[in-house]
């Protein structure tokens, strides 16, 4: 009899403890995984990383090789694999192509697109841009050894045109060029069809036309806001970008 009571007590204790652990896990802040775009690198998120870490978030900034969409998705997947709980993926520009596919991982609870590509299944950057208004970006691109760089003038005039000369020089020096083939890499099934999605349109964007951004945001049925910013909004408007990320991370609509 005493043995039976002990077992019942032990089981009840374990049930309570397990429930408490589950509740604790559910209440934990998601890990924020940043995915940069072409002509940037993981350091472009420095402002947001520092602010989020100060608020108790775990943060990972992916370093994409931009050799192919598959390579970048694999790089992002390795970052997701490091995380035990929920993940919010934040993609800028080309990074949107990456999170659209990597976001299918079950750990990913939400997606944040910042002036980013949001392809449908089978779409490439070239395809989704084909019928959109064009910018002057192409005249500032510099091919070299099978990769595409952006010129110093391009950084100043269309990519990071709202930043100080010192910041622009840093952006130019730290850029990650893209393999010339990535613009035709096709996306797989998009995660935005299944996951809560946020989109920030850069109203002053001279790299991706704002109307194309609006089209993609509407197609995703994303919660959308517009920011009077150039393409690299995480550098030109760090506080506003941080606010959107925190909104996504604290949303009650995150995928469980």
Question: Where are the language model's segments positioned?
Answer:
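Short beta-strand/loop motif that positions the catalytic acidic residue
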Residues: 199-201
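Flexible "cap/lid" loop of the alpha/beta hydrolase fold
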Residues: 107-156, 179-182
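Conserved acidic catalytic loop of the alpha/beta-hydrolase fold
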Residues: 71-87
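Conserved HGGG/HGGXW glycine-rich cap/lid loop of the alpha/beta-hydrolase fold
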Residues: 27-69
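Conserved loop-alpha-helix segment in the C-terminal half of the alpha/beta-hydrolase fold
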Residues: 203-229, 240, 248
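Gly/Ala-rich beta-loop-alpha elbow adjacent to hydrolase catalytic centers
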Residues: 90-95, 99
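Bacterial N-terminal signal peptides
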Residues: 8-17
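Active-site nucleophile elbow and catalytic-triad environment of alpha/beta-hydrolase enzymes
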Residues: 173-193, 203
């Amino acid at each position: 009899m005493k043995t039976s009571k002990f077992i019942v007590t032990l089981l009840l204790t374990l049930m309570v403890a397990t429930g408490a652990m589950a509740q604790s896990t559910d209440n934990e802040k998601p890990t924020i995984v940043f995915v940069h775009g072409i002509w940037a690198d993981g350091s472009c998120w420095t402002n947001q990383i520092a602010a989020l870490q100060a608020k108790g978030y775990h943060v990972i900034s992916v370093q994409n090789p931009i050799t192919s969409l598959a390579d970048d998705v694999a790089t992002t997947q390795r970052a997701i694999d490091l995380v035990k709980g929920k993940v919010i993926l934040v993609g800028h520009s080309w990074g949107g192509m990456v999170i659209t596919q990597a976001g299918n991982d079950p750990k990913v609870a939400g997606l944040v697109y910042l002036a980013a590509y949001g392809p449908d299944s089978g779409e490439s950057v070239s395809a989704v841009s084909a019928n959109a208004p064009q910018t002057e970006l192409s005249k500032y691109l510099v091919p070299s050894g099978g990769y595409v760089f952006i010129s110093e003038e391009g950084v100043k005039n269309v990519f990071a045109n709202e930043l100080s000369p010192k910041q622009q020089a840093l952006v130019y020096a730290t850029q990650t060029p893209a393999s010339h083939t990535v613009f035709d890499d096709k996306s797989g099934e998009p995660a935005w069809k299944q996951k809560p999605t946020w989109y920030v349109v850069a109203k002053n964007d001279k790299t991706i036309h704002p109307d194309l951004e609006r089209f993609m945001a509407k197609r995703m049925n994303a919660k959308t806001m517009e920011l009077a910013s150039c393409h690299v909004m995480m550098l030109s408007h760090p506080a506003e970008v941080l606010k959107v990320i925190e909104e996504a991370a604290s949303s009650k609509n995150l995928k469980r």
